[in-house]
Swiss-Prot record:
It comes from the Bacteria. This is Uncharacterized protein YdjY. Keywords: Signal. Residues 1-22 form the signal peptide. Disulfide bonds: none annotated. The gene is ydjY. NCBIfam families: ydjY_domain. Coiled coil: none annotated. GO terms for cellular component: cytosol. Residues 161-190 form the 4Fe-4S ferredoxin-type domain.
Amino acid sequence: MLQHYSVSWKKGLAALCLLAVAGLSGCDQQENAAAKVEYDGLSNSQPLRVDANNHTVTMLVQINGRFLTDDTRHGIVFKDGSNGHKSLFMGYATPKAFYEALKEAGGTPGENMTMDNKETTHVTGSKLDISVNWQGAAKAYSFDEVIVDSNGKKLDMRFGGNLTAAEEKKTGCLVCLDSCPVGIVSNATYTYGAVEKRGEVKFKGNASVLPADNTLATVTFKIAE
């Protein structure tokens, strides 16, 4: 009788162990699947590509479909920054990595924006031509084609710099749509506060061009001058 219970107990324990192992294996597979983010040779572990000869930086991003209808002043924000959910494109690169990549590509940061002068100063620095591409896109679209300015004005994107402020604030801001003292790149067409404070302009993604929510894409920054 004791032997029977001993055998049954051992079989039960073995079954529990198998279930536990299977469960852990399933969790590992789910985690690996969730962790794998890849497109056009870039990934969450290698989100930037620098071509110093052609003066370009290419970044892996993901579309945030909310801002195909809602307004935002945030073009691209690092996904783990405090503003990571507020941008049209969620970036996989950190502000520091992006800043260093632009310098490696030949860009010169303007470093003219401060918290004190932000509402009266237009960002300076190397001018950037920005394009966006994704699987199935008809072409690489310019930033002006994928972002709608309610005033119909052209974007004037500049390598502002601001790495110290970016690391202090930890917002994750990579590309802002008005001049910004924190974002690595921002739009010299408007001064800070034009969107959220003074209501001079509204920005959103161009839903007639951009793909669906969560689509992976690449954004390429070319040093223009």
